């Protein structure tokens, strides 16, 4: 209601003058009009609402009715109000935050103080509404109930008019109370949503301001933007409520003292004593929650790593290791959650416990002092204490909100005070100079704000937000710095690039080469401004485009990935597609360039991802191009086409910096730089450097394969065949080679071309509104997970006994008053008069007192037992569901991970687990307490005043209609909110992956804009969901006000046969029921909504189909299998899913034991699919693979995969130590580890690290270069001692020299093994025994490389010719 308009983001106008009150609060003042005269066309109906519509949530009624009649979707709901939008509120919050920092500095700045300033006007208005509500709430039970009871016990029945007036007054106060209460929540919800969107947007903007991230982990960011932002939402809702407690306590204390005397102070004291106890419990809860959140971050981070590295984990059969790791972390998390749960459960139970203790102690003390007590006084005090119970009842909500918000604000402040370093990039003075580095010495940024990390964690974690699945994460621009390991592991940052000096003029092509870890990618990072300049100058002129070493692909279609926010120009776009060799790929995709690319490009091959990344750069039409090894993932034909058509022709006149390991391309560069150990070793033209016969010339000789068996003869033959073919023919072949099938190692959709304007069935499955609908099966699953029906029944019994004891105490007091009071009613002159003896009888044996005190003790005892039992049960359920879902997902086939976005899975394991761990128990506990209290109230009222049930039955029809509409609407809105959260999650993770690319193309604003759109969409659905709860609550309250009025009339007008104590009990209970019934229904609905998370997890338990494990057949497999390593494919066919084309079609081949086979073919020919088949990541459509006379389908998956070894195309390292990455199972000695490190030329690098084998490996292994990561993966493979080795482009990220050394190592280390090598660089397969050439999933050639090279029409000879011709 109250707040700034969408364009008034501060109190000052552009000239610095303070805005007038009317200007700042114009929208809010319009809302103050009781009834707006006519409907307007605001995007959100709340902006057209008058005060009555706003306070009663009537503006939401059309949405509720629509939800009952039709299924709601994201598109059918109105958008978020502009006044509540991310953009406006983030700007306003930022102004206040900057003022705070300017005033006290970043370290002393209080984010909590800024939050208060941001919402104080609205909070004050909320408090005013709450105070008015509390005054009305206290007035009814204290004054009016007392007057009504006094009236019926001491006044003759002839004065009916007074009784009716008192009843009308009671109805008025109760109705006004619920109206002010609804108004307070209406204000609160919009306040909370504004705070949520403001801070989440500001956090995201701040994270995106960094070019590299060093101060936060991936697990933290997911938790902060999901759980923490929601914690602030709840804090904004509940924190203002305690402000009314002092007023309520004073009013009730004064009146209690007035009607009861000094003994009323006993009950008041009980409340006052318990309030600091709750505050202490809040502090304790905050401590436990803070500890639990840090463990949750670790679990989410490890889960993220698992999901993004799932392919390698499956190939290495490490599922059990990861399951144990996750389960161990979960156990630690559960222990901390248990402690927090005990405290929280105690807080929740305090309301009924404190109320009972206060009432019992007050009356017991009163009676022992032999003070007089009548029914009007007793039940007025009870009604008043029940009103005071509100102060204790709301405190658990407020305490929990404050505890969690304090933790969240601390985490958020850490992000907000972190500032990106100033840019060191300057502008060259000469306009013809595009790049200028003069004596530039650079280092990686020192990590900050990670106090929790051990000293060894001072390693430079340069952009820890990227996904841990290396083949899918975005930028490897900072990777080549492993050679500087001892320097950047030290306490202060040391240089990685030393005294770099060179100049690149406009239109020139600079080639950069060097060994693994020499600093090539670091140099690109330096040009992007991602490092720290220690000395010298780095000058860059003009806008640039950047192609990272491993392509960043975001979720969207191909065209969106290429355009990257630029306007579509058909001619320019088609040309870009052609020169990047994508035309045939797009034609074969089911929807052309409108085909949806799965998250991280899951349905594309590595070469396709890289060419789309290159196409994005070409289409951007920039002056400077930084290309970090863009052609390593494509074969020779495609590489030649792209280099000739794209880099040499299309980019002619542009300035290009090309980092490459494919040294044949350097001949065409205007200048070449050779890096070694972060320094320029040689610099000049290709010709000059060759004439110098230095290190560069040696690298070129390595390229020519002088170490291979007679490769010169093979090359010479290929060259002869090349000369026979015209250049035009070769170019045409190169274009045709630009993409046969779409997907290599991933699933193709279909070969049939479909209308690109109507994509109907894309790869990534979207969540439907029906997913997550809560049914009885959901509760059944949850109950079974919690320990079974017996355990759940015992927990319910404890709730029953606790609330029953509380209700019994009040009922027993009524009995006591009934028996002990001498009330004589007689008819005199047609009037009924009652005289009361105001002293209680039968106190000498103290039976009534003892039973009364026993009821208090039982409430306390059952409350404590219930708290421990309920917390253990709910956490057992959430942990059981977590483990079951994780175990199901772990064993799902790769197709599941290809079609399910990681953002959606992370949503399940972060936000949904937070719901099950914390929020569901909290709501469920309150609901069960309220439910049993409602039941006991109805039972007692039926016993003492049965006519009340007739009144309730009369309004039951209206109640059921409301409930039906409400239940359906809330369920629909919760589904929509869940669905809209997943794209928001995916965008966050995708943006952090592509941080370097986003900055290079200057698309930060576009990325933030999309975040705001998705954030607003999800927040609007969250707001609608919560408003729907209040929509129902208000209408239920009004119904119960009518019931209260009717009961009050019946009490006033009823016959004298019903005792005064029964009437008093009925009135006090009906007042309590008036608010309690709607709270119970609403809390129950909220609890059911929280069960949506359980249902979403249950769906994975039911729908995740495990891989076909096929256990051993008895006697079919020897213990030492495979002993030889012979592989036979028999008529083998494979497709990724039903109704999709075959990716391997009728393979028949035999590979003898100990042979080395090079597998080559164009992009998408099925090379990587061969590896998927061998490891049974995909089951065959028909045919068999036989290894040493054993059909692999008869072997258990774990047994099969542990016997084979895969060295992946993209290196995968996990967070941990070097030792853990080499030997996760801990089954090898240190000596064995050093031996394999020496054989892979990594021993010296690891020896330089302070911790050596125990040195930390950061997320994605980013403290090692890509090449070094690959060498570590090679060392890992050597340890496994397998008879069959598959190398999938394993040396693509290595320079030719290291490649040569590694190839010789492979030949020596695996000489008794069968080795299959998938490669694009043909020099890596020339020394193989056999070469397997694939095309369209079929074997087209299979022979010795020299034999195939001598055949002029062989496909292998054409591939060689293309490479040699470069």
Swiss-Prot record:
Residues 470-492, 726-749 are annotated as: Disordered. Widely expressed at low level. Highly expressed in testis by Sertoli cells and Leydig cells. Detected in testicular germ cells and sperm (at protein level). It is a multi-pass membrane protein. Keywords: ATP-binding, Endoplasmic reticulum, Glycoprotein, Membrane, Nucleotide-binding, Repeat, Transmembrane, Transmembrane helix, Transport. Probable transporter, its substrate specificity is unknown. The keyword 4Fe-4S does not apply. Residues 474-492 have a biased composition (Polar residues). Belongs to the ABC transporter superfamily. ABCC family. Conjugate transporter (TC 3.A.1.208) subfamily. This is ATP-binding cassette sub-family C member 12. It is found in: Endoplasmic reticulum membrane. Residues 726-748 have a biased composition (Basic and acidic residues). The gene is Abcc12.
């Amino acid at each position: 209601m109250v707040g700034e308009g969408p364009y008034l983001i501060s109190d000052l106008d552009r000239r610095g003058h303070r805005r007038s009150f009317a200007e700042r609060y114009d929208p809010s003042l319009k809302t103050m009009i009781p009834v707006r005269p006519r409907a307007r066309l605001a995007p959100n109906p709340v902006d057209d609402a008058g005060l009555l519509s706003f306070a009663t949530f009537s503006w939401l009624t059309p949405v509720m009715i629509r939800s009952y009649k039709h299924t709601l979707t994201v598109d059918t709901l109105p958008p978020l109000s502009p006044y509540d939008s991310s953009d406006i509120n983030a700007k306003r919050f930022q102004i206040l935050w900057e003022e705070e920092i300017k005033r006290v500095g970043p370290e002393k700045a209080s984010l909590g103080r800024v939050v208060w300033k941001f919402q104080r006007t609205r909070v004050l208005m909320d408090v005013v509404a709450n105070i008015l509500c509390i005054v009305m709430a206290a007035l009814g039970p204290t004054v009016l109930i007392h007057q009504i009871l006094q009236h019926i016990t001491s006044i003759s029945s002839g004065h009916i008019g007074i009784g009716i007036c008192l009843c009308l007054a009671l109805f008025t106060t109760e109705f006004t109370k619920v109206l002010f209460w609804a108004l307070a929540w209406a204000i609160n919800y919009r306040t909370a949503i504004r705070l949520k969107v403001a801070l989440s947007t500001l956090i995201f903007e701040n994270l995106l301001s960094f070019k590299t991230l060093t101060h936060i982990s991936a697990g933290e960011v997911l938790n902060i933007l999901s759980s923490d932002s929601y914690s602030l939402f709840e804090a904004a809702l509940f924190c203002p409520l305690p402000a009314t407690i002092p007023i309520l306590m004073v009013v009730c204390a004064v009146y209690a003292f007035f009607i009861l005397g000094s003994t009323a102070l006993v009950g008041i004291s009980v409340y006052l004593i318990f309030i600091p106890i709750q505050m202490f419990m809040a502090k304790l809860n905050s401590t436990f929650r803070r500890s639990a959140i840090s463990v949750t971050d670790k679990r989410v981070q490890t889960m993220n790593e698992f999901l993004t590295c799932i392919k390698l984990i499956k190939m290495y059969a490490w599922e059990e290791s990861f399951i144990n790791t996750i389960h161990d972390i979960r156990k630690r998390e559960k222990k901390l959650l248990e402690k927090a749960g005990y405290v929280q459960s105690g807080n929740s139970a305090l309301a009924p416990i404190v109320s009972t203790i206060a009432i019992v102690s007050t009356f017991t003390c009163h009676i022992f002092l032999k003070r007089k007590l009548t029914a009007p006084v007793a039940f007025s005090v009870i009604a008043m204490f029940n009103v005071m119970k509100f102060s204790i009842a709301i405190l658990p909500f407020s305490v929990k909100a404050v505890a969690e918000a304090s933790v969240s604000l601390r985490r958020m402040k850490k992000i907000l005070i972190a500032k990106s370093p100033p840019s060191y990039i300057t502008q060259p003075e000469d306009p013809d100079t595009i790049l200028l580095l003069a004596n530039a010495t650079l280092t990686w940024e020192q990590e900050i704000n990670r106090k929790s990390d051990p000293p060894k964690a001072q390693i430079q974690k340069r952009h820890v937000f990227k996904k841990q699945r290396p083949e899918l994460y975005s930028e490897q621009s900072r990777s080549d710095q492993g050679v500087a390991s001892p320097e950047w592991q030290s306490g202060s940052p040391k240089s990685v690039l030393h005294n770099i000096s060179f100049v690149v003029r406009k239109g020139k092509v600079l080639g950069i080469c060097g060994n693994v870890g020499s600093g090539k990618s670091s140099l690109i990072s330096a040009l992007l401004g991602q490092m720290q300049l220690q000395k010298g100058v780095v000058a860059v002129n003009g806008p640039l485009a950047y192609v990272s070493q491993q392509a960043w692909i975001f979720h969207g279609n191909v065209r969106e990935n290429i355009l990257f926010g630029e306007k579509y120009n058909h001619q320019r776009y088609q040309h870009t597609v052609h020169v990047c060799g994508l035309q045939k790929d797009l034609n074969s995709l089911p929807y052309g360039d409108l085909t949806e690319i799965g998250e991280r490009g899951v349905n594309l091959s590595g070469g396709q991802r890289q060419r789309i990344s290159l196409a994005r750069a070409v289409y951007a039409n920039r002056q400077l191009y930084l290309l970090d090894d863009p052609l390593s993932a494509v074969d020779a034909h495609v590489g030649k086409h792209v280099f000739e058509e794209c880099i040499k022709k299309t980019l002619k006149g542009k300035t290009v910096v090309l980092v490459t390991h494919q040294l044949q391309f350097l001949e065409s560069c205007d200048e070449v730089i050779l890096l070694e150990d972060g320094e320029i070793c040689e610099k000049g033209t290709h010709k000059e450097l060759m004439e110098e016969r230095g290190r560069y010339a040696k690298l070129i000789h390595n390229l020519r394969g002088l170490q291979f068996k007679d490769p010169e003869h093979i090359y010479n033959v290929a060259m002869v065949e090349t000369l026979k073919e015209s250049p035009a023919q070769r170019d045409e072949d190169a274009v045709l080679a630009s993409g046969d099938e779409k997907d290599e190692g991933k699933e193709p959709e279909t070969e049939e071309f479909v209308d690109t304007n109507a994509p109907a069935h894309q790869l990534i499955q979207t969540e439907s509104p029906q997913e997550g609908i809560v049914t009885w099966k959901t509760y059944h699953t949850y109950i079974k997970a919690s320990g079974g029906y017996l355990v759940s029944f015992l927990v319910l019994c404890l709730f029953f006994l606790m609330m029953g004891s509380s209700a019994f105490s009040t009922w027993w007091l009524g009995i006591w008053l009934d028996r002990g009071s001498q009330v004589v009613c007689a008819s005199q002159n047609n009037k009924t008069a009652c005289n009361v003896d105001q002293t209680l009888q039968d106190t000498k044996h103290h039976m009534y007192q003892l039973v009364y005190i026993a009821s208090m003790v039982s409430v306390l005892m059952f409350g404590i037992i219930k708290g421990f039992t309920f917390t253990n049960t709910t956490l057992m359920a959430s942990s059981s569901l977590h483990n079951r879902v994780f175990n199901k997902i772990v064993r799902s086939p790769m197709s599941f991970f290809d079609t399910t976005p990681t953002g959606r899975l992370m949503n399940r394991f972060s936000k949904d687990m937070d719901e099950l761990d914390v929020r569901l128990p909290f709501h469920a506990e309150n609901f069960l307490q309220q439910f049993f209290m409602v039941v006991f109230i109805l039972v007692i009222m039926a016993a003492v005043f049965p006519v009340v049930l007739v009144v309730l039955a009369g309004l039951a029809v209206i109640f059921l209609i409301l409930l039906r509409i409400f239940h359906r609407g809330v369920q629909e809105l919760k589904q929509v909110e869940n669905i809209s959260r997943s794209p928001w999650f995916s965008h966050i993770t995708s943006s952090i992956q592509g941080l370097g690319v986003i900055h290079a193309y200057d698309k930060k604003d576009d990325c933030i804009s999309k975040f705001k759109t998705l954030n607003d969409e999800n927040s609007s659905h969250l707001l609608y969901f919560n408003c729907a709860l209040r929509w129902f609550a208000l209408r239920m309250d009004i119904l119960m006000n009518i019931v209260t009025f009717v009961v009050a009339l019946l009490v006033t007008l009823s016959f004298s046969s019903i005792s005064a104590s029964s009437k008093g009990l009925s009135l006090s209970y009906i007042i309590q029921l008036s608010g309690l019934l709607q709270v119970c229904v609403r809390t129950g609905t909220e609890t059911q909504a929280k069960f949506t998370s359980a249902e979403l997890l249950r769906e994975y338990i039911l729908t995740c189909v495990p891989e076909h494990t096929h256990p051993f057949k008895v006697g079919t497999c020897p213990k030492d299998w495979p002993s030889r390593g012979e592989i036979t494919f028999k008529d083998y066919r494979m497709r990724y899913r039903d109704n999709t084309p075959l990716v391997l079609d009728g393979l028949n081949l035999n590979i003898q034991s100990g042979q080395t086979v090079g597998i080559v073919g164009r992009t998408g020919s099925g090379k990587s699919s061969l590896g998927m088949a061998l490891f049974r990541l995909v089951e065959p459509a028909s045919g068999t693979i036989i290894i040493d006379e054993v059909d692999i389908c008869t072997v258990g998956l774990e047994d099969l995969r542990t016997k084979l070894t895969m060295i992946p195309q993209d290196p995968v390292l996990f967070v941990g130590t070097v030792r853990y990455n080499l030997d996760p199972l801990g089954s090898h000695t240190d000596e064995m580890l050093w031996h394999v490190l020496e054989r892979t030329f990594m021993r010296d690098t690891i020896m330089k690290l302070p911790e050596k084998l125990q040195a930390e490996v950061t997320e994605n292994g980013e403290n090692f270069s890509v090449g070094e990561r690959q060498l570590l993966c090679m060392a890992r493979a050597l340890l496994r001692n397998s008879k069959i080795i598959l190398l999938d482009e394993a040396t693509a990220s290595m320079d030719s020299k290291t490649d040569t050394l590694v190839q010789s190592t492979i030949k020596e280390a695996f000489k008794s093994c069968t080795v299959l090598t998938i490669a694009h660089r043909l020099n890596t397969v020339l020394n193989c025994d056999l070469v397997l050439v694939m095309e369209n999933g079929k074997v087209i050639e299979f022979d010795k490389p020299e034999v195939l090279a001598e055949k002029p029409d062989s496909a292998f000879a054409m591939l060689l010719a293309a490479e040699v011709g470069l």
